Amino acid sequence: MSKSNQMSQSFVMPNDAVRFATMIMTGQGVSNEDAAIIAECLVEADLRGVQTHGLSRLPVYVERVQRGLVKAVPEMKLEKPVAACASLDGDNGFGFLVGRKAMQEAITMADSCGVGVVAARNSNHFGMAAIYLLQAVKAGYFAFVFTNASKAMPPWGGREGLLGTSPFGAAAPAGKLPPFVLDMSPAVAARGKIRLAEKRGEPIPEGYALDENGQVTTDATAALR
């Protein structure tokens, strides 16, 4: 165990972290298979250095299930009007499950048609976009991922949040070399970074956010108001 000025940190093996997160999610009524998918996505984010989309979000997801904001056992429905396009209704389930299923369906369609496009709706936060990009890359495909987001960013010169951060990503296999993976957002920083700073009692870098008066702030709590 190592210690910083703000808090102590414990280091565990990835497999142990996955088992822990799986146990937490099954305790909320999520099936073993789905809980394992969620856990793997969270741990993968931590392993890639994206702590804002890793296990730090586990308490939030648990709370959302308990409050009835997310379905622990969704009944997703796929509509496929043409051979290479489909629409997936996530039934308000976890975004990880919807995203995984949507990309797998896109891969299946690409296997037979050369391309696959899936639009998902009635979903929730799906974590790190790179997860689904890598899913496609491992199958040998180029991939694009886009998602919407609630309004959070003010337009240039404004102070009211009117624009969503709406992350997007692209990836391409590179043979024996590591794949190209782009996972980004129009925002300066993910809101999760600000939440993590607030949790740790740390200031955020200047330029990350504005307070409720439209002034630049380094106070994470003020930035989240």
Short names for language-model regions:
Residues 54-107:
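Active-site cofactor/substrate anionic-group-binding motifs, chiefly glycine-
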Residues 2-28:
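Generic N-terminal amphipathic, Lys/Arg-enriched alpha-helix
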Residues 153-224:
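Phosphate/diphosphate-binding glycine-rich loops and adjacent basic-rich segments that engage nucleotide
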Residues 26-29, 47-51:
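N-terminal and secondary-structure boundary signal
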Residues 87-175, 181:
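A generic, well-ordered mixed alpha/beta core segment in the N-terminal half of proteins
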Residues 32-43:
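Short, well-structured alpha-helical segments
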